[in-house]
Amino acid sequence: MPRRLDVLDAPVRLTHDGGELLARAGEPLLLSLLVGKGFVLSRSPKLHRPRGPYCLRGACEGCLVRVDGVPNLMACQTLAAEGQKVETQNVIGSRKLDVLEATDYLFPRGMDHHRLFAGVRGVSALVQAFARRVSGLGRLADHAEPPREAKRLEIDVLVVGGGTAGLSAAAELGARGLLADDQLALGGALRVLDPPRAEALVRRARASGCKLRPRTSVIGLYVEDRERALTALLVGPEGAISVSARRVVLAPGSHDPVPLFENNDLPGVMSARAALSLLRQGVLVGERVAVVGDGRFAAHFVEASSELATSTLLDSEMVLSAHGKPSVSSVKVRAGSIERRLRVDAVIVDGPAPPAFELGVQAGGTTRFVPERGYLLELDAERRVAPHVFAAGSAAGSSDSEEDGKGAARVALASL
């Protein structure tokens, strides 16, 4: 079970399913949930399999909870505060013992709810009514939030992504740029790999005069007038913002790799980047950790936790399956013709990270497949993905994100 490595000073008190938890004000709510309740935080919509956090970046559904009557909030992106009421969603029973988990055993090959008992007189209507009651995630909010009018901004250059490439681009753009990133803090991968360097990049970008907006997702990039500007839809703490940008620099980074073994969705299986992020924030995922695959995040985790946990390094091809109820407690591995089980508290996964190409494609760009990397955005000689849209960093296949970000910003400015 995850545990804290430090003592909470002046903690805030909140409740989770009626039980009291202690947290540090302003930290991600997920930390106190993991330490106080373990890895299982919710259930999947259809088969009600146990769910836990995988990425800690708001990109998976493993930490969705109801907070103060508001459904489907990501605990990794929600800040802990005094008096919060946190509730588990999508269970009949409890997080660890959900009655509807039986569907996972009754339908081992999956359930086609569209045809289940279809046409059976007297039964079909009952099944449909029940399915509608238990489907979906969460219940409507206790109180509807009044609508807020979207703000509108016009800028020269919008930078998407607050990692090394994005911050480097922002520093070049200065007051002519606006940077949006969906994380609680700027810095991207450097935030966990090299925190001091991440802080230095943030300070440099802020000193340049560039407007920095953490906790702000760019959820759409629309080509409405190729001769003048693109429209980006941003969503953050202030609500929706419609941004008209003459140029866009995409630096969204990469997604966490997905492990390819049976039961890879068990709570306690997470990315090495997520485990390292927890460690940087004072939470250890477990005393016995299986490290599957290799990469920067796995290497840093093993080094940083060497005196706190026992790490077992495994090639990704060795791992056959994860086991445990309701969270992972062992992995089955194969070396040659020999299979055995290893007892673990957590499984962390690293490896080639899939580039985040989605916004580039939405803006009209194309991708190319590189076997060892995945689908990368296709660039021309000036880093252009589509008219008025440039890309930098790992999404573009760069090996030097800092210089790549600077270069993309310079080209974007020169094209105005």
Question: Where in the sequence are the language-model features?
Answer:
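Residues forming the flavin
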Residues: 2-12, 25-74, 79-416
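Short, contiguous acidic and Ser/Thr-rich linear segments
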Residues: 17-27
